[in-house]
Amino acid sequence: MARAAGLRALVGIEAAGRGRRVAASPSPGGTPAASRGLPGWPGFCGVGCGSSSSSSFAPPRMQARRAAGSAARTRSPSQSNGWITGGSASEDGRLSWDYSSFKGRRPSMEDRFSIKMTTINEQTVSLFGVFDGHGGSLAAEYLKEHLFENLVNHPELLRDTKLAISQTFLKTDADFLESVSSNPFRDDGSTAVTAILVGNHLYVGNVGDSRVVALKAGKAVPLSEDHKPNRKDEQKRIEDAGGIVVFDDTWRVNGLLAMSRAFGNRALKHYVKAEPDIQEKVVDESLEYLILATDGLWDVMRNEDAVSLLKAQDGPKAAAMKLTEVAHSRLTLDNITCIVLQFHHGKSTNSN
């Protein structure tokens, strides 16, 4: 994502998860949580703080424990000419998912994604996220490696999931900025949109303009709202903090960044926060699919169009590929990454 003038990009693609080989080119077709000290999070240090490993952050009773056996059935990884795709299904058959990530017309790949299945105190927790880097891939890569690791070690994850998500986003942002503080010539940033499943509750947290859209009762239902500088509440927040919102091919914070919240972006941090908006939904039988995607998809596709394409496909594998192919065919200029998550209510499924 080209967001700020003069910021460098890194070449290459790295993403969590595993996949399968595909063709080289597509066919046509609230109140902030404290970011310092983190009240209510005693003993949490966070990535980049001291020498402790992530496994030592939380009290022992809340340590994330891997479920007996494999948490998910996963296909072999594959990556070819800027593409990476793949998918898995949960052991209990209630979830299946696929992802498709493509460099597209950009010279470098700044998107990342992460998928994590774990068990905490006998409660299954499933975490899905996409991260769209700008000014380089350092921030997106850091989120891929650390955001969910921090979250599953938060001592309040099961009791107060919204608090845990908010504090983890802010802490991980502070940790990232500390990790790159010795390099004044880099000012990478990233979006994050996440879907966290704890029991039958879904928590969607977003920072920036990546998006989650649900197929619910046959209709497209957005579960996140893009953080754009010209959104009235965001513009007021930025201007109250002393920043400005100006139009330069699109609306930008201080004439630079085309989103109003992000991880990283040290030079604009006073205006561009990593505080997430969080939505909580109960998972019932009307919830069929989720699409998590970067704006390489949403810039050229309405929510309703994406859901229509999804409904015409046979499962998440075909849907993830089709969404990416169509976005590319519509001449998106950005990297494209999407995760398609399917809910199987009252039945089990085998991975493809």
UniProtKB/Swiss-Prot annotation:
The keyword Disulfide bond does not apply. Residues 18-37, 53-87 are annotated as: Disordered. GO terms for molecular function: metal ion binding; protein serine/threonine phosphatase activity. Keywords: Hydrolase, Magnesium, Manganese, Metal-binding, Protein phosphatase. It holds the Pfam family PP2C. Mn(2+) 1 binds at residues 132-133. GO terms for biological process: signal transduction. Residues 23-37, 53-75 have a biased composition (Low complexity). Binds 2 magnesium or manganese ions per subunit. InterPro entries: PP2C, PP2C_BS, PPM-type-like_dom_sf, PPM-type_phosphatase-like_dom. Residues 96-343 form the PPM-type phosphatase domain. Its cofactor is Mg(2+); Mn(2+). Its EC number is 3.1.3.16. Mn(2+) 2 binds at residues 132, 295, 334. It catalyses: O-phospho-L-seryl-[protein] + H2O = L-seryl-[protein] + phosphate; O-phospho-L-threonyl-[protein] + H2O = L-threonyl-[protein] + phosphate. Belongs to the PP2C family. This is Probable protein phosphatase 2C 56. It comes from Oryza sativa subsp. japonica. The lineage of its organism: Eukaryota, Viridiplantae, Streptophyta, Embryophyta, Tracheophyta.
